[in-house]
């Protein structure tokens, strides 16, 4: 029996995601043995959240050195360009991409009183929350999901904003008070999606992964990530994007670029054929840059 090693971070969420993937792989390839190997990343060791690839670099290095054969990532953690020698082999069916609100007393973001404290780990969420509710106080909230839920329970925050997908994958959907409307708070490009990464030229690993590939999810995140790449903003700027694929093959993409304080933002949308997902993302980025996005990025830098 052939053995395939699947690498992942060691957090509860990363392991839940990877176990889900491995179970699907086992169903499709029962003659193959899949082993999970956890890898500690710089992000797990407290690296600055303003660095790129802090949750993936060590896993990618293990892939390149052949310690593992497949890497399972949260797609939003991946830089928009793959390292030399690696490729994304598969994007499985995407989980809910939206952000969600969990409150201490208030059960909706709009019901929080002025001056209430909201916790989030993301400059994108912070900027969009402040754009909606400039009367709120938004503070950093980091750590794993359990740590963030404990901070809410301890009364350190009046509410917190997280990704829906993580809570759902951890069977914590019942903790969600409100799904935030993407018309007001756009998620991160690729949020809710997983990426299965392999070495270029490893046809076996690529074939194994491709069995889980979900083309509509792939086209959606491809457009969103192209928008991010076209802005040249990196994965840590206040950028949101969300694409939808209609039954007739039309892809609709909406994107936003904000200043960190949420006082200025440019939001735009585009649509076209799903086969042009990447071009649509790049075109939308050019549109946002021409509408004043360059000035916003200059402020951020």
Swiss-Prot record:
Gene Ontology biological process: protoporphyrinogen IX biosynthetic process
Cofactor: binding details: Binds 1 dipyrromethane group covalently.
GO cellular component: cytoplasm
GO molecular function terms attached to this record: hydroxymethylbilane synthase activity
Superkingdom assignment: Bacteria
Pathway recorded for this protein: Porphyrin-containing compound metabolism; protoporphyrin-IX biosynthesis; coproporphyrinogen-III from 5-aminolevulinate: step 2/4
Cited InterPro entries: HemC (IPR000860), Porphobilin_deaminase_cofac_BS (IPR022419), Porphobilin_deaminase_N (IPR022417), Porphobilinogen_deaminase_C (IPR022418), Porphobilinogen_deaminase_C_sf (IPR036803)
Recorded catalytic activity of this chain's protein: 4 porphobilinogen + H2O = hydroxymethylbilane + 4 NH4(+)
S-(dipyrrolylmethanemethyl)cysteine found at: 235
Protein's UniProt keywords contain GTP-binding: no
UniProt key word Cytoplasm: no
SS bond list: none
Family per record: Belongs to the HMBS family.
Miscellaneous information on this protein: The porphobilinogen subunits are added to the dipyrromethane group.
Functional note: Tetrapolymerization of the monopyrrole PBG into the hydroxymethylbilane pre-uroporphyrinogen in several discrete steps.
Family matches, as PANTHER family: PORPHOBILINOGEN DEAMINASE
Listed name of the protein: Porphobilinogen deaminase
């Amino acid at each position: 029996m052939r053995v395939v090693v699947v690498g992942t971070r060691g957090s509860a969420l990363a392991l839940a995601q990877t176990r889900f993937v491995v179970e699907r792989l086992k169903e499709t390839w029962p003659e193959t043995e899949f082993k999970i190997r956890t890898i500690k990343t710089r992000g797990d060791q407290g690296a600055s959240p303003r660095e790129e690839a802090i949750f993936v670099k060590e896993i990618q290095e293990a892939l390149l050195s052949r310690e593992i054969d497949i890497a399972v990532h949260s797609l939003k953690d991946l830089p928009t360009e793959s390292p030399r020698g690696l490729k994304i082999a598969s994007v499985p069916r995407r989980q809910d991409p939206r952000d969600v609100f969990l409150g201490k007393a208030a059960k909706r973001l709009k019901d929080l009183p002025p001056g209430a404290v909201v916790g989030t780990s993301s400059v994108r969420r912070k900027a969009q929350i402040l754009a909606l509710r400039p009367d709120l106080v938004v503070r950093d909230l980091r750590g794993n999901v359990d740590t963030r839920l404990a901070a809410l329970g301890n009364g350190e925050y009046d509410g917190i904003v997280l990704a829906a997908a993580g809570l759902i994958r951890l069977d914590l959907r019942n903790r969600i008070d409100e799904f935030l409307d993407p018309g007001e708070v756009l998620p991160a490009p690729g949020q809710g999606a997983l990426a299965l990464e392999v070495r270029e030229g490893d046809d076996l690993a690529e074939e194994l992964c491709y069995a889980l590939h979900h083309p509509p999810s792939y086209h959606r995140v491809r457009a969103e990530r192209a928008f991010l790449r076209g802005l040249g903003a990196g994965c840590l700027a206040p950028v949101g994007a969300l694409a939808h694929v209609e039954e007739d093959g039309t892809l609709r993409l909406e994107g936003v670029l904000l200043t960190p304080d949420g006082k200025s933002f440019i939001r735009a949308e585009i649509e076209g054929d799903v086969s042009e997902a990447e071009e649509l993302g790049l075109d939308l980025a050019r549109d946002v840059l021409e509408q004043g996005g360059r000035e916003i990025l200059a402020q951020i830098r």
